[in-house]
Amino acid sequence: MKPRMLPLLVVVVFLAIPSWAAERQRIQLLVPADKLAEVRALTSPLPNSPETAAQGKAIYDGKGACFRCHGKDGNGNGPLAARLNPSPRNFKDHGFWSQRTEGEVFWLIKNGSPGTGIVGYGDQLTDGEIWAIIQYLRSFTGEHGPP
């Protein structure tokens, strides 16, 4: 490496750290620590199928109105996204599913997450509807059901 490149490299790394830290913050645990083991063990009672994902899509686009924040394509750019801080989750991000269990996502949809735009939908959606939405969310990365 040329000596003149070192200052440039330092500047690039320095500027990248806040972006990396912001993304790490978005992946932080949102389920209370005393419930985490129980929540991570939750699994969907629904069949892992394209039909279940289609049911989830209908709820995502309709009754659940998830698209308003997360976008029609699940990339976090729905019509209300610009008003939210932090930004809505991008479900096309493969890294998200490697760091969250379906049980955690179920709990967050049902109970909400303070400090984010997601309110609890447990009084509006049945458990089955929430599980169907989760299967649809997985389809954004080409997956169905748990890994």
Predicted regions and their residues:
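Bacterial N-terminal signal peptides
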Residues: P7-A16
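Bacterial N-terminal signal peptides that target proteins for export
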Residues: M1-P7
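Detector for the c-type heme attachment site
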Residues: C69-G76, K110-N111, R138
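Electrostatic cytochrome c docking/interface patches
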Residues: L29-D61, P147
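Gly/Gly-Pro-rich "capping" loops immediately C-terminal to redox-active cysteine motifs
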Residues: K57, K72-E102, F106
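Sequence/structural segment immediately N-terminal to covalent heme-attachment motifs in c-type
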Residues: E51-K72, A81
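Sec/Tat signal peptide C-region and signal peptidase I cleavage site
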Residues: I17-A21
